[in-house]
Each structure stands twice: as C-alpha cells, then as structure tokens.
Amino acid sequence: KLVALYQKEMSYAGEIVPLSELFFRDEQILGDDEQEVINGEQVPELMNHLYGKLEVLEPFEAAEIKKTIKEVQKETGIKGKQLFMPIRVAVTGQMHGPELPNTIEVLGREKVLSRLKKYV
C-alpha cells in the first residue's frame, strides 16, 4: 500500500525511502508554513471531532476515513483548506502528499490518533 501511495511520484523504487519518511518518524518537525496552518483557531475543534470519530471507526480504511472527514466537515462547518490542511499537517507534518484518506489508512489508527492528540 505504501508504494502504491507514491507510485506517480517515483521514477525508480529507491525513491520510496525519502518520500515515505513520514510513515516511520515518531515526531513531526514542522516548518513555519506548517506551524501557521496548525495554529489556526479552528484546529482544536477540528482535531477533537476527527479524533473522536477515528478512534471508533470500523473498518479503518480509506473509503470510511473519507466519509468521516466529510462528516466532520458537516458537523463543524469547517471546509476546504481550513479542513484538509490542518489534518494533513497534524498527521504527516507536511503540506502536500498523497491522498489524505489513503495516507491515514496506511499510517494506521494508533499513529494517527497519537499525532492528532497533540492538537486537540
């Protein structure tokens, strides 16, 4: 699944190592842009809603994760970049990357919840 996430970005298999670093790091190192995103006033409410839903989500798969993010959008009224960017930064430490629901699935529930909890 990990290789499939980055298939379009890779020319050869060895490129997977730097691309997939976020999956193996315990601590996120945020740059100024990422820090600005994660400091948004909507972030605690957003992370709290998402954390609660992902904690009990079954099955923990991309399609269900995508639906869950949509539910959080409806419940909080937070949408667009205000919704997706803080989730991406909290979960990956990056502003860009592969499809967010797929990334969340591959990271796994435990790692995702641990990362979200820092911003609740």
Swiss-Prot record:
Its main location: cytoplasm. One of its GO terms (molecular function) is glutamate-tRNA ligase activity. It catalyses: tRNA(Glu) + L-glutamate + ATP = L-glutamyl-tRNA(Glu) + AMP + diphosphate. GO terms for biological process: glutamyl-tRNA aminoacylation. Its EC number is 6.1.1.17. GO terms for cellular component: cytosol. The keyword Protein biosynthesis applies. The keyword Cytoplasm applies. Keywords: Aminoacyl-tRNA synthetase, ATP-binding, Cytoplasm, Ligase, Nucleotide-binding, Protein biosynthesis. It comes from the Bacteria. PANTHER family: GLUTAMATE--TRNA LIGASE, GLUTAMATE--TRNA LIGASE, MITOCHONDRIAL-RELATED. Monomer. Belongs to the class-I aminoacyl-tRNA synthetase family. Glutamate--tRNA ligase type 1 subfamily. This is Glutamate--tRNA ligase. It comes from Staphylococcus xylosus.
